[in-house]
Each structure stands twice: as C-alpha cells, then as structure tokens.
C-alpha cells in the first residue's frame, strides 16, 4: 500500500492532539508503523519562525498584521513544509499525519476573516498545485465548547483570541467545505471522549480497508 497523508482539522479545543493519538494507534493496529507528524503552521525551521510571527500576539509589537499578510505567511509556511518534509516522506513510503493543512486557511481566512474565497482557492492552486491530503478528519465543535477547552489549557494565541462570531463563521465554512469533499470526514467532537475516539477508529479503519479493496 502506498503511503498516505492524513490531516486532522477543527476549531481550537476540538481535540486534535487526542485524535492524532487515536489515528496513530489505529494505523499501528492495521500494521502501519512508518509515520511522521507535522503541524501547521510549523514543521520546519522557517515555518516555525513564521508560526511565531503569525500566532504570537507580541511578535510584531503594536503593528497590526493585515488579513492578506496573515494568509501569505500561512502559505509560505505551508509550501515550505510540503516541499521539504511532507512530499519527501510520502515518496519514501512514510505516512504523514498532519495537525492542520489548507482546509484551515479556507475556513479561518475564507470564513472567519471573510477573505475572498476565489482568491484563496487561486492562491492554494498556485502554491500547492493538485497536492491534497488523502483523508481529512474534521472534528466539529461549537465555538463555545472549543474555546472553553482552549482557555482551560492556558494563554490564548492571537487567533484564539478572536470573537465567537469569527469562530462561528469559521465553523460554518468548515462544514460547507466538508459537505463538498468526500475525502473530508466530519466527526462530532462534542460527544463524550470515548464516542469521539470510537468514531475516529471506525472512520480510519474503514478507509484503510477500502484502500486495500
């Protein structure tokens, strides 16, 4: 079986770290053990510096990061990660498990920020070409649930401090995009933890078995 790229998506507090652990455990039970893990923005020295710039509320002092500057920094970090880490890993037969990818930009910047969706799609295609994840698990939570969990973790980053309206628009765009793409599987992450973990296991197991069919 050829290596695959699996991405975990969702609002802050959706449970992406727990989901990643369940995905890894499930893949290992299916005999897949050669894996690497990525996060966006980040995952390379350059991309981590861009992550600090775009997420650390103190990174540029009093200067306001404009919406377009923000999205371009996300794409700069993304293409560096894809070209130097993800594609080489896949070419070497290693599975890649990612914490966020382009769907985040389409939802957060296209939905939350209200940036023109055609422009974002054009930018995505120019930067990434036809490169896409093989499977995306979208963990769906309401902003109320997600931000409550995020706040319990500690200090919020620049984007986590956005309004409920911002996150409601982001979630709506996530759901809209998920409904349009069969490679995106929506998991109700407001369920009890065991139910969420079970849904992830079932989704990943069935998907891998279909690859073998």
From Swiss-Prot:
Keyword Kinase in record: yes
Superkingdom: Bacteria
The reaction(s) this protein catalyses: dTMP + ATP = dTDP + ADP
EC number: 2.7.4.9
GO biological process: dTDP biosynthetic process; dTTP biosynthetic process; dUDP biosynthetic process
Amino acids binding ATP: 10-17
UniProt enzyme class: transferase
Single GO MF descriptor: dTMP kinase activity
Coiled-coil region list: none
Signal peptide: none
One CC-aspect GO term: cytosol
Keywords, sorted A to Z: ATP-binding, Kinase, Nucleotide biosynthesis, Nucleotide-binding, Transferase
InterPro entries for the chain: P-loop_NTPase, Thymidylate_kin-like_dom, Thymidylate_kin_CS, Thymidylate_kinase
CDD domains: TMPK
Biological role: Phosphorylation of dTMP to form dTDP in both de novo and salvage pathways of dTTP synthesis.
Entry's family note: Belongs to the thymidylate kinase family.
Protein name (database record): Thymidylate kinase
Species classification: Bacteria, Pseudomonadati, Pseudomonadota, Gammaproteobacteria, Enterobacterales
Gene: tmk
